[in-house]
Every structure is written in structure tokens, then in C-alpha cells.
Amino acid sequence: MRPERESFDVIVIGGGHAGCEAAAASARMGAATALVTHRFSTVGAMSCNPAIGGLGKGHLVREVDALDGLMGRVGDAGGIQFRVLNRRKGPAVRGPRAQADRKLYAAAMQAAIRETEGLSVIEGEADELIVVEGRVTGLRLADGREFGAGSIVVTTGTFLRGLIHLGEKNWPAGRVGEAPAMGLSSSFERAGFTLGRLKTGTPPRLDGTTIDWSAVEMQPGDEPPEPFSVMTDRITTPQIQCGITRTTAATHEVIRANVHRSPMYSGQIKSSGPRYCPSIEDKIVRFGDRDGHQIFLEPEGLDDSTVYPNGISTSLPEEVQLAILASIPGLERVKMVRPGYAIEYDHIDPRELDPTLQTKRLRGLFLAGQINGTTGYEEAAGQGIVAGLNAALAASGAALTVFDRADGYLGVMIDDLVTRGISEPYRMFTSRAEYRLTLRADNADQRLTEKGIALGCVRSARTLHHRTKMEALNAARTLSKSLTITPNEAIKHGLSLNRDGQRRSAFELMAYPDIGWSQVRAIWLELSAIDPVIATHLEIDAKYDVYLERQSADVEAFRRDEGLVLSEVDYQLVPGLSNEVRAKLEKARPFTVGQAGRIDGMTPAALGILAAYLRREARKTSKAIA
């Protein structure tokens, strides 16, 4: 783990969720990689809530896992309560989530980093990017040490000129108790990047031994718990329950009487916070007609009495936070371990990036995580793995890879960022994806692992596991389609079918809403030999089969436009474009015609002109070669 060299193929700055995935992915690709972090002991720290996954976010965890990333396996090692959200809804919108033990999670992540071959850890503060002729060539630390690099991935989280706010007080910090990164922001500005400011927040931490648990509703996890990673056979960590309580009218009165002391409302903070994770004072101001707001009481560990009250993020003064807590059922006598706070930090407009997460301004420089304007561990991890594998490819001189909107939520998120930019911290939701039926959490490995194998970021153990699983799934699908039955025979087995004389296969029967795997297995005993995991995949495929056929046509049309590459086009030479459209295209520099179509204000006519121009140029090139 100790650096034995002064130059690396890839240097990753930051040991958070994005940085760990980037560094590990780069090393798996065979690149000599260094992870630069203030202290190795903080690697894998969960700065805010002690949980992984959720709606949309769980899809990202599964996709990171499909590319042999760390978060899924580490989440399984540290998970102390697993739940699949939206379980009553269709598989496309279900979100796997795990409550985590902070210590177990960090320990598992640190172990994974230590065990990654080809990955060194450098403790120190990154201070300045070394740039030569528009390309990053190395990194200078605050203590004067310099390291050369073929590529650099920056994953600084909230540390870029971080500033914590608590009531009327504020002080520089990357998170509570840790210094911010000041020099890197200046380095970005010298390179010509425009920096913006964003804000996020965290709730107070509570002493769980002082909570009246009898006054709150208890919420158990799923039994048995469902792991994130396909490489995890079963969860062996002890499982816990969480509590649920609500704010009251008295809570709201305390907040209204003191809202002027909140940095967000006093004018002390002018940057935007996450719309879908508002502070409790924001909730009361924006949703003043509600009687109460739900609070989840989430234990932070098996041997830690600290509790995270999910739902009351705040930066109000400490004494106000104590008054708020005292007005909430179950928390009347609670002791506050640490007050909540808000933090402001620098970010870069993600439209400065191309879809590989490489900056357009400096070659060899990749960005991932909150520096790109996202919020959340899972969003950071997803960007980290893409940036890390592309940084390794760039360092070796190989072609970079793009994950598009039909590949997965990774592609949806990155395309949203680099095409549309952000005005507030970006969070993933299933509603952001056009191809939700295809991009399910349950089939992430089926969609992405072969791509990861081809790229070189998937190790041999997972490759063998994946191909064995796919052989079993294909064999089960073939068998289920070969077993057929008449309507009369099906009715004798208790199934409700039209008497139309048409034979139907076991696979076709499972497409019916009221027929599942258990019913068809009862008819054909040979299906009993199929592994339950494979059977679940098969049933979901059958339910969605007709819809997936329709969606595949949409994906094919999407891919046609994504195949028309615009990266080298001089828009002044394209006849028929309006000056307004030319200006939009010059500013955005879209990668493909498909991406151009997602720029605000782009017209169908302009897209037709671009597609026709590219086809004409391709024909000219073909004739010239001939």
C-alpha cells in the first residue's frame, strides 16, 4: 500500500465513495494507481446517513457491483438492516437498501482498498494539478511532494473550499473535524474552470440510550435479507430494527420562531441545496400545511448507541435543535451527541465534461462525485467507477468508453450531468430513466458484467460466476419455453385461461398477472431443479417479455442517434443551422446527435440537419478512401 514510486498511471484524489471506486477500478484495469487522501483511517467514511441504496440509488449500487466495484460487497459486509423498497410495485422500480454499521462499512472498504493489487495509498493534502500544454501530468501535495501521472481523477466531495454553517457560526472544514481542500480550487480556476457553490446538510446525532423506544413505531428489515452483490451468498451480520416518529405542531412552532437564525434564511448561505433532501426548516416553510413530517431513527452501529434521525437535517443553532428534539415523540429527553450542520463547497459545471467524465478543458483529468454537482454515496460511486476505468484507459492510450442511457442508470446520470448541467445537487430517481423496464436492479449484471469483462475491470472470480449464472439462466429459459400445456390441462391444475385450444409454455404462462413460478413448478416437476435465484429472474423476464420487445425497438432507435458522433464537427460548416442553434451546439459540444437532442431548445429540424450532414460527410470519406 505504501508508494514505492514517484509516478503512477493514475492518481485518484479523495478517499470517499467516488474515490474508492475510481482507484479500485483503475487498479483492476492494470494501471499503477495511487489514492491520495488526508488520512487512510477516514477512507470509506459515511459522512451523512448510515445507509446504502434506495429508490434509484439501489440500481446504481447493483450496476457498480456488476462492474466488479466495491460498494455492493462492502454494503453487504456492513449492512445491519436490509429492505427492498417498493416491493409491492413492479421489479423495475424496486430499490434495494441497507442500513449500515458505520465502523463495519469503513473497515470493509479499507480492507478492500488494502487488498487491491496495484493500488498504493498516499496520505497528504492534494494542493495543485501539474499541467503541461493542456494536459495534466502530475500532482503536487501541500507538503511539497510531487507525483507524476498519466491521468488524474478528482473526487473531493464536500472538501473543495468546504465551509460548515451552524446557526450564526461558520468555519472552514471538509466535514466536521476535518480540514477542507483549499489549493485545488485555485488550481481549477487557474486552468479556466468556472466554479460554483452548492450546499448540503446533516441532522444532529442522538444518544440512542436516551430515546424512549416504546413511544415510536419499530420497523424491521426483510427476512431473509437480500444482498446487494451477486457475489454475496447470504448476509451473516446481526440485523436490527429502526424506529419511526414524526414532528409535531410544537416542533413546527419552534422552527417558525427561529427560522431567521437558519443560515439558509438569514442570507448567510446563498448556494442551492438538494431539492429532494431538504432541511427540516425548509420543509416547514415549503410545506407549512402538513401536520407532521416522518423521521426514521437509524442506529449507526451494532456496538454504537448513536442514532441518526433521518428527516431532520438542520443548521439551526444548537439550543434550537435541542428544543426541536424535545418536541418530538420518543425524543423528549434525548441527549444530542453532535448538532446538525450545513456545509457549502465548490463544484464544477458538469457540462465541462464529456460522457467519459474527462474534462474538455484538460486532457487526462477526470472528475467524479459531488464535484460534478451530485449528492449521495451511490451517485458518487457510480461516477467513480466510470471515471476510474476511463482514467486507466486514457493512461494506456486506449479508446475511452461511454455508458449510455440504454446501458444503465450510470449512463442516465452521466448523460443528465454532462448534457443538462445542474442548478442544485443531482439525485438519482427511477423516473429519470426512459428504459426503466430494461434497466432493473435485478438484471444489472446481465446488462453490464460482459461489458466490464471486455473492458478489463472485472476479475476472474466474478467472470466465472457470471458466465455460470448466465448458462443456468439460458438453460432455464430454454426449458421453460419447451414445456407446453393446453388450456384444458391448465384449468385442471387450477389456472384460469381462455379455452382457445392454444398450447402455452411455462414461460408464457408466467406472463399472466396471477400465475407465477410456484404454479408452473407444480405442473412440471423438472422445474424444481432450477435454482431459486434463476427462477426469480425467469419469472420477471416472463412478466415483462412483451413490453421488453417493444422497448427494444425504442432502444434501437436511440442507439442509431447515439452512433452519429459529433465530437469533431465544426458547426460553422453545417449549412441550414440557425445562429441560435449553432451557439447552443458550440457551447455544449455534444458527443452525439442523440445527446444534442437532449440540449434545451434543440429542434427536430436541427437534429435532422446534423444527421444528414454526418451521413454526407461519411459518404465523402468513403469515396475518398475508395
Swiss-Prot record:
Ligand binding (FAD): G14, G15, G16, H17, A18, G19
Annotated protein name in UniProt: tRNA uridine 5-carboxymethylaminomethyl modification enzyme MnmG
GO molecular function terms noted in the UniProt entry: flavin adenine dinucleotide binding
Family of the protein in this entry: Belongs to the MnmG family.
Source organism superkingdom: Bacteria
Quaternary structure annotation from Swiss-Prot or TrEMBL: Homodimer. Heterotetramer of two MnmE and two MnmG subunits.
Annotated signal sequence range: none
A GO biological process held by the record: tRNA wobble uridine modification
Cofactor: FAD
Binding-site residues, NAD(+): 273-287
Main location: cytoplasm
HAMAP family xrefs: MnmG_GidA (MF_00129)
Swiss-Prot/TrEMBL keywords: Cytoplasm, FAD, Flavoprotein, NAD, tRNA processing
Any single Pfam family the record assigns to this protein: GIDA
Organism, scientific name: Bradyrhizobium diazoefficiens (strain JCM 10833 / BCRC 13528 / IAM 13628 / NBRC 14792 / USDA 110)
Protein location: Cytoplasm
Gene that produces this protein: mnmG
InterPro entries xrefs: FAD/NAD-bd_sf, GIDA_C_N, MnmG, MnmG-rel, MnmG-rel_CS, MnmG_C, MnmG_C_subdom, MnmG_C_subdom_sf
